[in-house]
Structure formats: C-alpha cells, structure tokens
C-alpha cells in the first residue's frame, strides 16, 4: 500500500491536497468538493464532520485519524488497487475532475454502491459467513488493530453480535480490554453501550471495573448522544453526566402562553407511541445535523470558486430504507423557521426526559411549546390531495441538480429492489430445498434467542448515520425479530450491485438512554409486543389506532431501533381484533413458494419497464402483481394467529393496492397539472419493494413454522 493512500494530507476520494472534512463511518478525510457529494448522499451513507469547525469528542477524532493513517481507504477502493483495474478502464477521481459528473459518480460508486470493496465468495448460507465474521470481530476488538475491525464490519460483521458461547458483545470485550478507539468504532456501527451480557453487566460496568474511567464516561455520553446534541444545538451546552445530570432542557426566551393550536400539537406529540416518538426524535436529530453542517459549510467555502458546482442540500436526502411517507415528513422539517424548530426540539427534549423517568403527563402550565403552524398549514392545503406523494419543493435555485439527484436515486432504488427480488428468488429456492431435505434448525434458533436475552437497547435506530444492518443484533437466517427487520441482510448479493444493504451500515448512532428502570420480565414482555408497535402509522408521525401499513424501513430501527424501553410501554394496546379467534393454520411452504415465484416474476417485468421508461406498461404489470398477491394472501387464514403473519399480509396487500394507484398516475391524464413521472416511478419502485419484502417475510415464516 502506498504512503500516498495512508497520508491524511490528501483527500481519500480524489487525492486533492489538505482535506478539511472527515467521513466518520468510512474512516477517511475528504476535500470540500468531495464533501459536497457526501452530503448529498445523506448521513445513512456518509457522516461528515469538519475537522476544525465542528466539536469533536477527542477519542472519536483520534479513531478516524488512526483509521485513515493506517489505510482504511483501501477497504473502499480494494479493487482499484489491483493493477488489472487499470486495464478495465476503472480509475479514481482526480483533483482536476469536475464535481459533476466525474467526482460525484465515483463517490456514489465507492460508498453507495460499494463497487470497489472486496467481496467474499457467495455461499449457500451467507448467515454462516456473517456469524463467522462477527465472531472474528468479537475476538479482534480486544486488540488495537482498528483497520482489521473496520474491514470485518465492511464485510458484514455485526457490531451488536451476541456471542452464543461467550455470552457477550464485541463492545463488552473492547470495554473490558480498555480499547477506547475500538469502542468508538463499534459505536459508529451501532454497538449499544446499554446491552447486558449473560451476567447482566453492560460495557460501562466492565470499563469501570477495569479502571478505564475515560472509556466508561465516553460510553455514557454515547448513550445520551441524541438528547445531548439537541440541547447543544439550542444553547451550546451539554448536561454534566459525571454529576448525574443526563438532560438539559433550555428555557424559552419569551413568556407567551401556548395557543390552543400549540397545546393541541404538544398533546399530540406526547400521545405518540414510543416507537413513533423515537423516529421523530431521530429525524429531528438528522435535521439538526443538516442545519449545523450547512452553517459550517457556508462559513468555510470560497464561494467564488465553488458556487457553480457545490451540491445544495436544501432538505434531508431520501433514505431508501425509509418509507416514502417518512421521507416526506423528514423533508418537511426544513420548512420550520428557527423559532418553530427550536420549540420542537425543546418539546422533544422535555418529553424524552418524561418518558425515560416514567413521569405522568403534567397538567400544569409548561414552559415550552410546540409550534407546528407550518405543518398545520400544509395539512389544510394538502388535505385535498393526500394521496399524492409529496416530496416538498423546498426552495432551491438548482432545480436541474435536484432532478439529477432524484433520477439517480430512482436508479439506486431500482438496483436495490432488483437485489431484493433476486434475494427473494434465492430464498424461495433455498426454502424449497429445505422442505425437501427436512432440515431443522429449531434447536439452534431457540438456543440463540435464549442467549440473546432482551436488553434495554437491543438494537440501534438506523436513522441518523446508518443504512441498515450494523445497528441490529445478529439474527440467524430465518429468525425475524421484527416484521420491518425481516428483510434479511445476510444473504448473498448479485454481482451487479454493491453489498450496500449489508455493509453500509454506519451507525454512530445518537441514541436515547438505555439505563431505564425496566425489569427483565417487562423487557421480555415488551419484546413480544414489538411487532405490534411496528404496525403503527407514521404519516406525519400520527398515532391513530387504525390498521396501518408497517414502516418499510427494513432495519431496526432501523425493530430496527435501539429500543428505548420507556416507562409505561406495557400499556400499548394490541392492534388485533379483540373478539376474533385466530387460526393457527398456515399454508404449505410449497404453495407459498409457488405464489412467491409468480410475484417475483411479475415484479421483474415491472422493473424492466421502469428501467426502459415504458410507463404505459406500469398498469398491466401492476394488475398482474395484484392478482398474484391476492392469490398468495388467499392461502393464509383470514385471522392468523401470528402477529408477524398479520403484519406481513397487511403490508403485502396494501402495497399491491398502492402500486396500482401509483401506476395509474404514470399515464397522462386530463388534468392541466403535469405528471411528475420521475416521482411516480420512485413510488412505484417503493411499492414493489414493499411487496417483495412482505413476500420474503411470509416465505421465512412458513418455512420456519412448517419445518418445526
């Protein structure tokens, strides 16, 4: 490896001199121009920080410096180091290249599609590979070799992996060994400082026992990173965790009484389920980061040279792991003015503290308010068109650039769905083979689930910094912890797409505190209810008790989420019909696989039509998909016993219905308003993605149940 690649004096992406930004989760330093592209990709791809004008925890900066100086960039450019790559015409961007399209395309290929990372040979059971990698990570973190651990994480090792024999996670091992930089890296990829091992001890406990007090204090800071960041955004101060102060809630500058509208909005915020409240808080965190990074960006740029090529980030970039509804809600946060956004942040801090402490709702006059006039206005103006996907046009002078990014986002979603569809086909085939051979992993799965006891923070939210897998505890193939989580990330990926769904998880996740007074029985009881929570609606973070479609985030949350076991969560109602008699009967695996193959075949036809811009083919394709979905749903009882089956069936059927509705919009209508075909295509792909995911869940469930 050349010294040039190891030097922190050059940009990791174009070799330009004097990089002033860092990509924390990638362990690289980047220049201003390349940073503009990183920002446009979103924090789920790259977490950027300015090296001088951003407040850094010292050990976090030291971790990034150590990684880059030891060649972490070669992980993301592995195949480019091969002399054969020169013959193939692939090359790295140069400082003289234009940002668009040269640098932008290279950076997207490098980090978003992972086109140059080392790929392990595909195996029949890729979950075994992930488990082996996670065990290697478990052993490696006791040493100081950061690059080895980042390489393992990039290959699919799980930062929250619970070692079945050792009874601990990698963060327990790193904390016991006093490896503070390893702990920083694991936290970036989703490791949970609040997870308990088989002895009931957390990484903080081991750090204190070993006399590693700096590490113990840092782990506590990581636990409260989300609320600390929000408080710092408002008042420039953080709570003093050493003295036991874990929340700092700034006071309002004025003494105005809450309006009736503000009181109603605040009450609605307080009535959100913990799951939806977590998602809203994480989205607000992302918006805080966007605004702070914008301020640093504008203060540090030489506008005379960069104004023509700088990528504008007027709102949060689309995260393909999230549903279109949630992405819309996230982008609407950019419409809040400074006062409105500050009061929203204050109320989130107040309610986070209340939920953690288990305090009842106060009827006294509060000193904070939630001003959502913007959203209220939007609701009144959008009520006539609620079915239209609304990616808000936040003010931007670079419409062409935004359209280009949207087009590329569509292509990325197409590739992701193709990967998912291919994965679904492989799973159906593998399941068929499993049924024929009668393979049985019941004992292994049950043992793993027993060892991986519910903890206060079983997995991290995937919002802020990650794309998906790293924040979740390791789950063996076919073992689904949440309906949203069942998009198995431990399967081989086709050669035409990067392993982004597997290895781009980069979670330095700001998270809620995990030191909550929940008993083990309560934790276990909540774990059994998580599937029901996942079916709560997320439209503008509403909390109505209807039969909503589940969030398609696919990751923990990121079930994907690091659980914030709030006080009183045990009172959440079951969404199932109270007087229905559930049926335990599930269809045969062979029947489910046969119908799944019909669905995947029809989805593939729709994808081809989307790629070739054959919009007139959308409707017939969607009708065939709807027929196949209806036939598959008819195989299952009307009132399944399993919550997971009910949720998956809801997602399957509702997505097929939405797909038909979206496909109709692709045809030119009589309306004088032009059809945004690009946006329609994005929604069509999203619906097809949801259908494929739901079908995969049902294949997994029936295979597991029928083989047990």
From Swiss-Prot:
Gene symbol of the encoding locus: Git2
Segments of skewed composition (Low complexity): 504-518
PANTHER family: ARF GTPASE-ACTIVATING PROTEIN GIT2 (PTHR46097:SF4), G PROTEIN-COUPLED RECEPTOR KINASE INTERACTING ARFGAP (PTHR46097)
Tissue-specificity statement: Expressed in the brain (at protein level).
Residues with the Phosphoserine modification: 393, 396, 508, 511, 519, 563
Record field: compositional bias (Basic and acidic residues): 519-532
Record Pfam families: Ank_2, ArfGap, GIT1_C, GIT_SHD
Residue ranges of domain Arf-GAP in the record: 1-124
Species name: Mus musculus
Zinc finger (C4-type) boundaries: 11-34
Source taxon at top rank: Eukaryota
Keywords tagged on the record: ANK repeat, GTPase activation, Metal-binding, Phosphoprotein, Repeat, Zinc, Zinc-finger
Annotated region (Disordered), positions in chain: 376-592
Functional description taken from the UniProt entry: GTPase-activating protein for ADP ribosylation factor family members, including ARF1.
GO molecular function ontology, one term from the record: protein-containing complex binding
UniProt repeat feature ANK, residue ranges: 132-161, 166-195, 199-228
Protein biosynthesis found in the keyword field: no
Residues with Phosphothreonine modification: 400, 536
Acidic residues bias: start-end ranges: 384-401
Compositional bias annotation for Polar residues: 407-438
UniProt protein name: ARF GTPase-activating protein GIT2
């Amino acid at each position: 490896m050349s010294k040039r690649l190891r030097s922190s004096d050059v940009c990791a992406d174009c070799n330009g001199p004097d990089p002033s930004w860092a990509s924390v989760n990638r362990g690289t330093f980047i220049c201003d121009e390349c940073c503009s592209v990183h920002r446009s990709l979103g924090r789920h791809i790259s977490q950027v920080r300015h090296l001088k004008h951003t407040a850094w925890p010292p050990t976090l900066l030291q971790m990034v410096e150590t990684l880059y100086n030891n060649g972490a960039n070669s992980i993301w450019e592995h195949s480019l180091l091969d002399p054969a790559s020169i013959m193939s015409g692939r090359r790295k961007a140069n400082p003289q290249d234009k940002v668009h399209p040269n640098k932008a395309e290279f950076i997207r290929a490098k980090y978003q599609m992972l086109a140059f990372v080392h790929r392990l040979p595909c195996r029949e059971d890729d979950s075994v590979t992930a488990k082996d990698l996670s065990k290697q990570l478990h052993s490696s973190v006791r040493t100081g070799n950061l690059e080895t651990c980042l390489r393992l994480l990039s290959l699919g090792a799980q930062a929250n992996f619970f070692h079945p024999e050792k009874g601990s996670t990698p963060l327990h091992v790193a904390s016991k060994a006093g490896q503070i930089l390893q702990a920083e890296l694991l936290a970036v990829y989703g490791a949970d400082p609040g997870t308990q091992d088989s002895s009931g001890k957390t990484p903080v406990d081991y750090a204190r026992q070993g006399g590693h007090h700096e590490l113990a204090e840092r782990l506590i800071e990581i636990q409260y990173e989300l609320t600390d960041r929000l408080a710092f955004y408002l008042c420039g101060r953080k709570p003093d965790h050493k003295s036991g102060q874990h929340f700092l809630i700034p006071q309002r500058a004025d003494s105005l009484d809450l309006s009736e509208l503000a009181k109603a909005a605040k009450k609605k915020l307080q009535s959100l389920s913990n799951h939806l409240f977590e998602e809203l808080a994480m989205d607000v965190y992302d918006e805080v980061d966007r605004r702070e990074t914008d301020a640093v960006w504008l203060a540090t740029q030489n506008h005379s040279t960069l104004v023509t090529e700088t990528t504008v980030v007027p709102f949060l970039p689309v995260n393909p792991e999230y549903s279109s509804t949630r992405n819309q809600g996230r982008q609407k946060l950019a419409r809040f003015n400074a006062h409105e956004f500050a009061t929203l942040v204050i109320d989130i801090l107040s309610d986070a503290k209340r939920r953690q402490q288990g305090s009842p709702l106060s009827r006294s006059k509060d000193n904070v308010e939630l001003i959502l006039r913007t959203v209220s206005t939007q609701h009144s103006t959008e009520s006539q068109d609620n079915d239209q996907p609304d990616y808000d046009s936040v003010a931007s002078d670079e419409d062409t650039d935004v359209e280009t990014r949207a087009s590329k986002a569509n292509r990325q979603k197409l590739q992701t769905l193709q990967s998912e569809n291919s994965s679904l086909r492989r799973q159906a085939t593998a399941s068929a083979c499993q049924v024929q051979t009668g393979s049985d992993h019941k004992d292994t799965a049950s043992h793993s689930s027993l060892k991986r006891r519910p903890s206060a923070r079983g997995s991290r939210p995937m919002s802020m910094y990650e794309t998906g897998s790293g924040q979740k505890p390791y789950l063996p193939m076919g073992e689904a912890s949440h309906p949203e989580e069942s998009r198995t990330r431990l399967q081989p990926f086709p050669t035409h797409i990067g392993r982004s769904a597997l290895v781009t998880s980069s979670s330095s996740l700001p998270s809620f505190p995990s030191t909550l007074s929940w008993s083990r029985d309560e934790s276990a009881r909540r774990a059994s209810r998580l599937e029901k929570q996942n079916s709560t609606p997320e439209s503008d973070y509403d909390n109505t008790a209807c039969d909503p479609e589940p969030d398609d985030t696919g990751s923990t949350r990121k079930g994907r989420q690091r659980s914030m076991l709030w006080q009183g969560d045990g009172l959440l109602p079951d969404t199932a019909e109270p007087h229905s008699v559930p049926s335990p009967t599930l269809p045969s695996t062979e029947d489910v696989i046969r119908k799944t193959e019909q669905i995947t075949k029809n989805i593939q036809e729709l994808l081809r039509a989307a790629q070739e811009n054959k919009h007139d083919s959308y409707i017939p394709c969607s009708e065939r998909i709807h027929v196949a979905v209806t036939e598959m749903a008819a195989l299952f009882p009307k009132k399944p016993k399993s919550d997971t089956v009910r949720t998956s069936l809801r997602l399957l059927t509702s997505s097929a219905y939405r797909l038909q509705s979206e496909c109709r919009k692709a045809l030119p209508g009589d309306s004088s308003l032009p059809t945004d075909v690009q946006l329609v295509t994005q929604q069509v792909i999203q619906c097809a993605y949801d259908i494929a995911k739901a079908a995969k869940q049902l294949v997994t469930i029936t295979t597991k149940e029928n083989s047990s």
